[in-house]
């Protein structure tokens, strides 16, 4: 076991504080509309340029073990904030650094760390209650666009694109961000249910130019097992032929005699048909087939529930307005499923999402939810260079997370003003002793730092601006760093999601409070390099030799 180095009390806290300050100084420059970029060296490829706080924080590794411990703990705040709200990582870092800095001073002055932490917790609870009380629900697409614009550093096109995507796929829909190969940033919306399985045979194609199979108003057979025998399939095929409608078969697989017969019928024009493999694997495949059956008002044909293929009637088949199948994906548009049944299925998936502990399962269930609820939107981020695309993608990701958070918990005035206004909530707090009161004061000072930093980054004097804002009693009155003007921030469209502001303070206070109560740090001692081997001397007795 390697030897350890142990530091105590103020020495320990001071060493950690140095590391925290280094990380905080690198992250805080990115805050606000006039925040600066940070360039990060990569082990291969071009350097990365970003304004994303958590990306900067994750890259910082310090040579001094004790300083690095402090930096890692604050990095944890940024990561936790990113997981909880997906935005506000810089704000969380700044708040945590302020709480630790002021708390360390108080402990050095002889105050009780545990009482300080209790005071911090009481103050944070009061601020959170104030934020929730003043939160305003997002009601319009314009407000969604404003939140996205602020998070994307004033890029209006990004805010509007996210607002359009949410409008089209709904709040439950999936919106993903990808890198584009072109210069333009585009929005691609897939309405209806799409899954990543294409046609089983190119002979099913109806549009040779586009290489797709399009079937209008088809019947849909949803089968759990493989289909290889023709005999069991014949009664359904005959019933569909008599109806004059097309047929789409979604099954684990269609092969052999069954596939050959379907292809022959399609080529002869006797039956418009297409066969597709079922999406997913194992239990997830069964769940997705049930989703398709509910969406199309059909029945999942499964021997488990006593339905044999030869007994299937037209009433058991699903219906949809149109189905579009290409080589790699199938899209069901306007399924005939009853709204009540689809909503019940959505509620069931939501409760499963709440119960699961696996991130992978949660992600897959959210995909299923989106497909049932509305659709999928893809924002393809373009740019002139790879570096520019990556930087813009970071901002679009942040903006997307911020808009989701805004829809979830509402919005507050931006620019750090909501936290500033919460100072009033700390005025009447009752605490047990003077040390706890100092804990409340630590939070009072910390919640002013984001607004100060935004002003500092835009070239103004943070202390002067914050003083002006506190003097004005209007809740939404604030400073627009982009235009260097004062006014009603909500009317100016400068708003922050309540969830982002709330979790930033809670995460910062959680780690900051623990750091204040630290009394010892244990870290590995740096390894001493062993001395190098001495150089070999010349061999003796070799003189007088000619070469």
Swiss-Prot record:
GO terms for cellular component: cytoplasm. The keyword Isomerase applies. GO terms for biological process: protein refolding. It catalyses: ATP + H2O + a folded polypeptide = ADP + phosphate + an unfolded polypeptide. It is found in: Cytoplasm. InterPro entries: Chaperonin_Cpn60_CS, Cpn60/GroEL, Cpn60/GroEL/TCP-1, GroEL-like_apical_dom_sf, GROEL-like_equatorial_sf, TCP-1-like_intermed_sf. Keywords: ATP-binding, Chaperone, Cytoplasm, Isomerase, Nucleotide-binding. Residues 534-547 have a biased composition (Gly residues). Pfam families: Cpn60_TCP1. One of its GO terms (molecular function) is ATP binding. ATP binds at residues 30-33, 51, 87-91, 415, 496. Its EC number is 5.6.1.7. CDD domains: GroEL. Residues 527-547 are annotated as: Disordered. Belongs to the chaperonin (HSP60) family. Together with its co-chaperonin GroES, plays an essential role in assisting protein folding. The GroEL-GroES system forms a nano-cage that allows encapsulation of the non-native substrate proteins and provides a physical environment optimized to promote and accelerate protein folding. Forms a cylinder of 14 subunits composed of two heptameric rings stacked back-to-back. Interacts with the co-chaperonin GroES. This is Chaperonin GroEL. It comes from Methylocella silvestris (strain DSM 15510 / CIP 108128 / LMG 27833 / NCIMB 13906 / BL2).
